[in-house]
Amino acid sequence: MTEVLFYHLQDMTLENVLPSLLEKSLERGWRVVVQSTSDERADALDAHLWTYRDDSFLPHTTWRARDAEDQPIVLAVEESNPNRANVRFLVDSAPLPEDSGSYERIVLVFNGDDNEALAAARTAWTDCTTRGFEVTYWQADERGRWQRRD
């Protein structure tokens, strides 16, 4: 069964959070697709993942690359799954893909300071529960550690 994790960002940016979530995914041996909503945003995330920390390396590419199928992390703007990922991150209110049930895990990261993003996340939550997915809600505590909320 697909597990869907909703990560509620407040007073933090996707750029601050995404690298560590991707690192944890790679540690677990997962292949990942990160779906954003525009070419420009995917390119900005691509640039950020190369430079976010001097002592780190996240092997990744964009969906345009010829070797996308060989990479553990692919940044995309469409519902394709070029690297046969078992985990899909949805950012910037990217919609749930039609094949959501084919993933082990979907990670929906949304900006809780943006009313439109919050409304889109609520709609996605309802859609996921209707589809019978296991859904969990995560929010950072005052130290920035992710805590599951019930």
Question: What role is predicted for each listed range?
Answer:
Residues 1-47:
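Long, hydrophobic N-terminal alpha-helical segment
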Residues 2-4, 25-31, 95-101, 123-131:
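ASCE RecA-like P-loop NTPase motor cores
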Residues 9-10, 36-39, 90-94, 111-112:
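Structural motif
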Residues 21-24, 48-52, 106, 123-127:
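Short, solvent-exposed amphipathic alpha-helical segments in soluble enzyme
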Residues 28, 45-49, 53-54, 131-134, ...:
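Terminal and domain-boundary regions
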Residues 47-86:
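Helix-adjacent hinge/juxtasegments
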Residues 71-109:
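Active-site-adjacent structural patch at catalytic or cofactor/ligand-binding sites
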Residues 105-150:
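Glycine-rich, aromatic-bearing surface loops/beta-hairpins
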